[in-house]
Amino acid sequence: MVHFTAEEKAAITSLWSKMNVEEAGGEALGRLLVVYPWTQRFFDNFGNLSSPSAILGNPKVKAHGKKVLTSFGDAIKNMDNLKTTFAKLSELHCDKLHVDPENFRLLGNVMVIILATHFGKEFTPEVQAAWQKLVSAVAIALGHKYH
């Protein structure tokens, strides 16, 4: 289990409270699909993913991205119990969707990039360290069913 200090929790929740989940969610998932094109195979029912502009403008990408970021919100509310928080999603992604758990780590890294672009100077190295710790812990929790 990952332990978050009070300072780390404060850094994470402070930025999260300013996050536009709908906008950033579509941006994060869209970036994942553009930068790591092999991840597109999990979204073949999303329609046109033929180019970066098609992906970033795709309403299904935006909607699912919002859903993904809403789950990150659950992580923030339950930082001390991520394994339980993501147990059902881990099972779904492992047993039904057969998603490579490495993709969770990639999405976490994309999330950090999105945060950096949205918050600039406010995204200090200390804040980044807290977020890296969170996205890594979320990736581990989502991959738990695979072990």
UniProtKB/Swiss-Prot annotation:
The modification Phosphoserine is found at S14, S51. It comes from the Eukaryota. Pfam families: Globin. InterPro entries: Globin, Globin-like_sf, Globin/Proto, Hemoglobin_b, Hemoglobin_oxygen_transport. Transmembrane segments: none annotated. Heme b binds at H64, H93. Belongs to the globin family. Heterotetramer of two alpha chains and two epsilon chains in early embryonic hemoglobin Gower-2; two zeta chains and two epsilon chains in early embryonic hemoglobin Gower-1. PANTHER family: HEMOGLOBIN FAMILY MEMBER, HEMOGLOBIN SUBUNIT EPSILON. This is Hemoglobin subunit epsilon. The lineage of its organism: Eukaryota, Metazoa, Chordata, Craniata, Vertebrata.
